[in-house]
Amino acid sequence: ITRNYTLFRYMLGCNAYGSVPTKFNGGLFTFDPCHIDEKQAFTPDYRKWGGGTMTAQNQRLVYWPMLKSGDFDMMPSQFNFYNRMLKNAELRSHVYWQHEGACFCEQIENFGLPNPAEYGFKRPAWFDKGLEYNAWLEYEWDTILEFCQMILETKNYAGADITPYLPLIESSLTFFDEHYRLLASRRGRKALDGDGHLILFPGSACETYKMTNNASSTIAALRTVLETYIKVCNNEKWQKMLETIPPVPLRYIEVKDSLNLQASTMTPAWKQTISPAKSWERINNIETPQLYPVFPWRIYGVGKENLEIARDTYFYDPDALKFRSHTGWKQDNIWAACLGLTEEAKSLSLAKLSDGPHRFPAFWGPGYDWTPDHNWGGSGMIGLQEMLLQTNGTQILLFPAWPKEWNVHFKLHAPGNTTVEATLKDGKVTNLKVSPESRKKDIVIMIEK
C-alpha cells in the first residue's frame, strides 16, 4: 500500500507545474490502447473520455490529496484552468439566462464551454440553450464548488495568497443564488420557499439522481464553501446567502432487525439517514451523493454532531450498498475512513491500493475511465490519508480509522501551517513530532487501546 501510494504521488509530480492540470484519464502516461481494450485500435495518444475535455467529478480526486501531502505548489494548474475560463462561464449565464454568475458544466472544454458531443448535436429547437441535452449531465453545475473549496483550503493549510481566485469563488456562488431565484420566479410569485430558502430545482445529485429538488450534495457544497469563504471575506452579502441555503435533507430507511423478533417475524427498525435529495425523478448512474456531506464537504465525520446519521447512511442506504465498490472513482474507502469505520476502511484501501494489472503497479484501471486511472489513485491516496489524520475544528485526530496492527510511519499536513509526523509500531504511538510545537496540544490520538 505504501509503495503504491508513493508511486502514484510520483506520477502526480511528473506534471507538477504544467500549464494544464494532470488529467484523470492517464496524466502524462499513455500507452497502446489495445492493452486496455482490444476494440480501441488507435495510437498511444488515445485516451478514453477525451484529451482536451475535463470531467470535474474525476479531476477533483486527482487534486484533493495534495492538501494533506503538502503538495500545494502543484495545485495552481488546476485552479488556473478554471480561472482562465471564468469569463466564458459568466457569458453562458448572461447569454442564456440574462443573470450574473459563472456556470461551469461538468464535462467542460478548456475554453469553458460544454463538450459539444455532451451538449448535443441534435437538440430540439425549444430546449434551454444553456443546458446540455444529456441525461447524465443536465443541471450538474455544482462540481466547480469543490475546486473553490480546494482554493480556500490552500489558504487554511499553507497561508496561500488566494486573491487571484476570489472572483472565481464569488461568481461560482452567485450563479446558484441568481439562477435558482430566477427559476423559482418563473414558476410562481416567490423566489424563495416558505422558510426563506433557495429552491434548488431542477438539480442533479452527481450524475445519478436527476431532476432533484434540493440535492444534498449541492446543499452541502454551498453551505461549506460559504461558511469557509465568510471566514476569509466577512461580507454581509455572503452571510445573507448562507441564510438562504436549505438544510441537508434527511429520510428514514426501514431496516429489518433480525435480533428483534416478535411473533416469529422480524420487526422493522427505522434509521435516519442523509437523503440524496428532497425528491428526484430517476436514477441515472452509480454514484452515492448522499455521502458527499461526509466527503468532500465534512459536515458529518469523526467528532462531529450526528455521526450516527452518516454511519447509518453508509450501512443502510440501499443505493449506497448497491453501488459500493473500490473501483475507479468510487469513494467508499474515503467515506469509511471519514466515519471512523476502521475495518471497512482497511478492506477497501487494501482493494483500492493493491497492485494494478500492469508491470508498473500504480497503473490502475481502466475502472470507469482509462488506464492509468488517476482518480483511482487519487481516491486511494485520500482514503489512506483520512485513515491516518483528520481534523475537527482545531483538533487534529490521529489514527481515526487506522488498524492498530498496521505499523506505519507518516508525515502529513494539517490546517494552520501544521505538519504531523508519527510512528505506530505494535499498537503504540512513538516519535510524534508536531510543527509548530504549539499545535501539539490539539493532537487527539484515537488508535484503539
Predicted segment positions?
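Carbohydrate-binding surface patches
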Residues: 416-442
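Mature extracytoplasmic enzyme cores
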Residues: 1-7, 11, 94-95, 110-126, ...
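Acidic/His metal-coordination segments adjacent to aromatic residues that form catalytic metal sites
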Residues: 28-49, 109-137, 198-215, 355-370
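Short, glycine/acidic-rich hinge or "gate" loops at secondary-structure transitions
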Residues: 19-30, 164, 182-197, 237
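Active-site core of glycosidic bond-cleaving carbohydrate-active enzymes
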Residues: 55-62, 67-91, 99-113, 130-157, ...
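Acidic/polar, glycine-enriched structural segments that form the non-catalytic walls/loops
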Residues: 1-52, 72-76, 82-93, 278-279, ...
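Catalytic cores of secreted or luminal carbohydrate-active enzymes
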Residues: 371-420
